[in-house]
From Swiss-Prot:
One Gene Ontology cellular component annotation held by this UniProt entry: urease complex
Primary location class: cytoplasm
InterPro entries, per the entry: Urease_beta-like, Urease_betasu_sf, Urease_subunit
Record's keyword terms, sorted: Cytoplasm, Hydrolase
E.C. no: 3.5.1.5
Name this polypeptide is given: Urease subunit beta
One Pfam family matching this protein: Urease_beta
Biochemical pathway: Nitrogen metabolism; urea degradation; CO(2) and NH(3) from urea (urease route): step 1/1
Single GO biological process annotation from the record: urea catabolic process
Location(s) in or outside the cell: Cytoplasm
Length: 101
């Protein structure tokens, strides 16, 4: 093996298979771009992002780990969210939950 070498299987890799998902329309009503990372609790994103926030509780973006979605000022786009896994406890972010979902 060479350092940094990757061994990739043939075929497609399905992310988050079998998890609950929801698609929301999100609008950036602010005057600055807002970027949201793959594992950020979407319910707690910047208040300038307008969407059906209650539907995002316990959800994150359904994108590859380590990537992000950027919302430009005035932009509206649809995003797919996926349910968080694990113990379903949320700490940090904006401090809106701080415990079990």
């Amino acid at each position: 093996m060479i350092p940094g070498e990757l061994f990739i299987q043939d075929g497609e890799i399905e992310l988050n298979a079998g998890r609950k998902t929801v698609t929301l329309t999100v609008a950036n009503t602010g005057d600055r771009p807002i970027q949201v990372g793959s594992h950020y609790h979407f319910f707690e994103t910047n208040p300038a992002l307008k969407f059906e926030r209650k539907k995002a509780r316990g959800m994150r973006l359904d994108i590859a780990a380590g990537t992000a979605v950027r919302f430009e000022p005035g932009q509206t786009r649809d995003v797919q969210l996926v349910a968080l896994a694990g113990k379903k406890t949320i700490y940090g972010f904006r401090g809106d939950v701080m415990g079990k979902l």
